[in-house]
Amino acid sequence: SSKFENGQVFTNKDWCNDASETSNAYGFAKSEAEKIMREWVSNRNVRLVTIHPSIVFGPILHQRHLEGSMSYLKHFVKGPPFVLDVHINFVDVRDVAIAHVNALDKGENGKRYIIHKEGLWMKEIGRILNSSLEGKYATRKLPKLFAYLLAMFHPKLSINQLKKTLGTHVSYDVEDSFVTLELPNYDIRTTLIDSVNSVKAQD
């Protein structure tokens, strides 16, 4: 959802109902597709389990994977020496992959499984990278005014977006997803190290 309270915890009962084609088109497409699928299986003898990951980090297979979610970590390798005051909820791609496989026979029919590991501020991610890898990674937080100025010229940022996200955070209740689906449960340091090393390997 694009509307949330600071500190809100989302559950598998929540839907992206406020999204539209012009506002959060990605969330709208995902939400509408799931609603259509759930309606379709409701009148058929078809088993349905859905997987809902937070932002997905981890080793990549191709340069095109540097866009999307991994652009957050690409910033630490190739971006400017500062970070936005943004909180990122993420999970390891390897946990997400196993979740999809194990859901086939271990997932409860009709259930929505949130797959999420941790939420960190970008400056915290920089600190973990600095303590784990060679090189220097950004930890200096860009002041809000300068962040808004940056958004005016950045193709992937908008002032409206930053007004919602700067200095705010949410989280997710994963319930028993990791246990039920028997996920490896990668620790955050491993995820971040493997992700950044994978980004560097694309050069």
Tell what function each PLM region has.
Residues H52-P53, F57:
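Conserved SDR Rossmann-fold cofactor-binding beta-strand/turn motif
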Residues N43-V46, G58-M70, A103-Y113:
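Glycine/proline-rich active-site loop of Rossmann-fold NAD(P)-dependent oxidoreductases
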